[in-house]
């Protein structure tokens, strides 16, 4: 009879320590070190590179419920943050399975090497279903994720750091995610066998100013695909400076952090923009900013919405859409003032997902209609906004669908 090798387990090289003292051990991936952040879970099956580079995830550790992440590697085309060198996005990641060698014709770099290059700390080899269930029952926790190849950790110190972190409430992260200076965007959406295109100067019919709270590239591409030249301006740009650019419309972008904190400087600007009668469109944090600007309130959610399979009802059409979401705060529907209508609602929990000002060309949605990753059910919202620009120019409306 041959002897069998004794049962062995790998020494933990990474840890997730929750604020309540829970310690989860795993195998480290990506960058080494430690970081305090909020833990959330994302239910999308694809698009991990877009998710991890979404600036809205700044200050968060993303747990992927899909077990196999990294199979198709990474590339330079799927990055979503506007300035990749700044590496704005998720600060930590948690996977069920080890990262395998990539197998895809578009793969340029292994996900582990990509995480290292971006400074993202990761942990794999844990029961992500159990962690997701914990978050679902208890809410998104503050935590510390740590990675040491030698497996040396001061657990008590990590517990203290996790407990001491104040969390996302009251935190203005848009100031970190925003661009440092103004820029012009002309890249159009990706086309099979052609890649991304460029909107020529002669083809730009409309001028949109994007207030950048942490904007995603695919949002800007969809504007360019509808013949909009986009000028991206930093989050703290004044209404006077925005109007001096003579835009046909203004876009309020997505972004991270507590909307109430960002609203300290953004809300007065948006209120002045509303008075200008220009068309205004907001997404995600931009939606929350608009809500605050009209007098509504925002609130921290129990676990947030993060995924590409969320059902939302559009009251303006009566249709249900499957959309991509990524937010931990929401506009309180009950706080919407007279003259402001709720246009969309989540069919998961009834939270607000859209609003418009009656009698003004101003509207916003909580979800991500640019579908990166995710379904394209809500692409019509970009055409709805462009139709407001066309109306001001006396042009016929585009078909929304």
From Swiss-Prot:
InterPro entries: Anth_synth/Amidotransfase, CarbamoylP_synth_ssu, CarbamoylP_synth_ssu_N, CarbP_synth_ssu_N_sf, Class_I_gatase-like, CPSase_GATase1, GATASE. Pathway: Amino-acid biosynthesis; L-arginine biosynthesis; carbamoyl phosphate from bicarbonate: step 1/1; Pyrimidine metabolism; UMP biosynthesis via de novo pathway; (S)-dihydroorotate from bicarbonate: step 1/3. GO terms for biological process: 'de novo' pyrimidine nucleobase biosynthetic process; 'de novo' UMP biosynthetic process; glutamine metabolic process; L-arginine biosynthetic process. Gene3D superfamilies: 3.40.50.880, Carbamoyl-phosphate synthase small subunit, N-terminal domain. The keyword Amino-acid biosynthesis applies. Its EC number is 6.3.5.5. CDD domains: GATase1_CPSase (cd01744). One of its GO terms (molecular function) is carbamoyl-phosphate synthase (glutamine-hydrolyzing) activity. It is an enzyme of class 6 (ligase). The active site is at 284 (nucleophile), 368, 370. Residues 1-203 are annotated as: CPSase. Keywords: Amino-acid biosynthesis, Arginine biosynthesis, ATP-binding, Glutamine amidotransferase, Ligase, Nucleotide-binding, Pyrimidine biosynthesis. It catalyses: hydrogencarbonate + L-glutamine + 2 ATP + H2O = carbamoyl phosphate + L-glutamate + 2 ADP + phosphate + 2 H(+). Residues 207-395 form the Glutamine amidotransferase type-1 domain. L-glutamine binds at residues 56, 255, 257, 285, 288, 326, 328-329. Composed of two chains; the small (or glutamine) chain promotes the hydrolysis of glutamine to ammonia, which is used by the large (or ammonia) chain to synthesize carbamoyl phosphate. Tetramer of heterodimers (alpha,beta)4. Belongs to the CarA family. Small subunit of the glutamine-dependent carbamoyl phosphate synthetase (CPSase). CPSase catalyzes the formation of carbamoyl phosphate from the ammonia moiety of glutamine, carbonate, and phosphate donated by ATP, constituting the first step of 2 biosynthetic pathways, one leading to arginine and/or urea and the other to pyrimidine nucleotides. The small subunit (glutamine amidotransferase) binds and cleaves glutamine to supply the large subunit with the substrate ammonia. This is Carbamoyl phosphate synthase small chain. It comes from Agrobacterium fabrum (strain C58 / ATCC 33970) (Agrobacterium tumefaciens (strain C58)). The gene is carA.
